Regions:
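Sec-dependent N-terminal signal peptides
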Residues: 3-13
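Hydrophobic alpha-helical membrane segments
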Residues: 17-146
Length: 146
């Protein structure tokens, strides 16, 4: 019970700029894990089945989705299976990261009258670096047959 108030109060202890960068890194990590799982599901389903033996095959196997495609037509295709859900999460996190970086850049431009290229480069490196790190670690986690 003590953990909940601590988790709720933790963001208040950070500085504003670190909160923005933490959001960029967190979104990159989530996007990287989602994309790594999506690629493992497609290219190495045996490793996914080995790591998650109790997962329903109808949920994680994208080959079985086309049989149920008429139920998931339109914008709700991400509820069809794990592959599409991971793709939806990855794209949503990319949009979130890009929006945060754009808002920071526009805010700096309005405050200073110029674009702070160094800060923009650091934010873009954090954005791409966190994504690639999480994706690589996810691939390594599922790489059980090496």
């Amino acid at each position: 019970m003590k953990l909940l108030p601590i988790l709720l109060l933790t963001p208040l202890l950070s500085f504003g700029q670190f909160k923005e960068r933490a959001a960029i890194v967190a979104a990159g990590l989530i996007a990287g894990v989602a994309d790594g799982q999506r690629e493992v599901i497609v290219h190495n389903p045996h490793a996914y089945r080995y790591r998650h033996p109790n997962a329903r095959e109808a949920w994680w196997n994208p080959d079985s989705t086309w049989r149920r495609a008429d139920r998931y037509a339109g914008p709700l295709v991400f509820v069809a299976d794990k592959y599409h859900l991971n793709q939806f999460i990855r794209q949503g996190m990319f949009v979130g990261q890009t929006t945060i970086v754009a808002v920071i850049t526009v805010g700096d431009y309005k405050a200073n009258g110029r674009i702070l290229w160094g800060k923009l480069a650091i934010n873009l490196l954090l954005m791409q670096g966190s994504y690639m790190l999480a994706k690589g670690l996810t691939h390594r986690y599922y790489d059980v047959f090496r």
